[in-house]
Amino acid sequence: MWGQGVRRFTTSVVRRSHYEEGPGKNLPFSVENKWRLLAMMTLYLGSGFAAPFFIVRHQLLKK
């Protein structure tokens, strides 16, 4: 008896909740401004690409 009530409550909560739909609405960052998105992606991907080179440079200069 109690289990059925819990099940009905959880399904009704899920049914009542609604998120925005559409392209880019399920991402943790905004895709509305393409220039800001370009800058953020360049910074993110560029830092990952450049990190090994900076680490090697640091190790070579460390002596």
UniProtKB/Swiss-Prot annotation:
Segments traversing the membrane: 34-60
Topological domains, Mitochondrial intermembrane: 61-63
Main location class: mitochondrion
Family annotation (InterPro entries): COX7C/Cox8, COX7C/Cox8_sf
Chain ranges on the Mitochondrial matrix side, renumbered to this chain: 17-33
Transit peptide extent on chain: 1-16
Cellular component terms (Gene Ontology): mitochondrial inner membrane; respiratory chain complex IV
N6-succinyllysine, modified sites: 25
Pathway assignment: Energy metabolism; oxidative phosphorylation
GO BP field: mitochondrial electron transport, cytochrome c to oxygen
Modified residues (N6-acetyllysine): 25
Membrane topology: Single-pass membrane protein
Keywords in alphabetical order: Acetylation, Membrane, Mitochondrion, Mitochondrion inner membrane, Transit peptide, Transmembrane, Transmembrane helix
Family per similarity comment: Belongs to the cytochrome c oxidase VIIc family.
Assembly mode: Component of the cytochrome c oxidase (complex IV, CIV), a multisubunit enzyme composed of 14 subunits. The complex is composed of a catalytic core of 3 subunits MT-CO1, MT-CO2 and MT-CO3, encoded in the mitochondrial DNA, and 11 supernumerary subunits COX4I, COX5A, COX5B, COX6A, COX6B, COX6C, COX7A, COX7B, COX7C, COX8 and NDUFA4, which are encoded in the nuclear genome.
Biological function: Component of the cytochrome c oxidase, the last enzyme in the mitochondrial electron transport chain which drives oxidative phosphorylation. The respiratory chain contains 3 multisubunit complexes succinate dehydrogenase (complex II, CII), ubiquinol-cytochrome c oxidoreductase (cytochrome b-c1 complex, complex III, CIII) and cytochrome c oxidase (complex IV, CIV), that cooperate to transfer electrons derived from NADH and succinate to molecular oxygen, creating an electrochemical gradient over the inner membrane that drives transmembrane transport and the ATP synthase.
Protein name as it appears in the record: Cytochrome c oxidase subunit 7C, mitochondrial
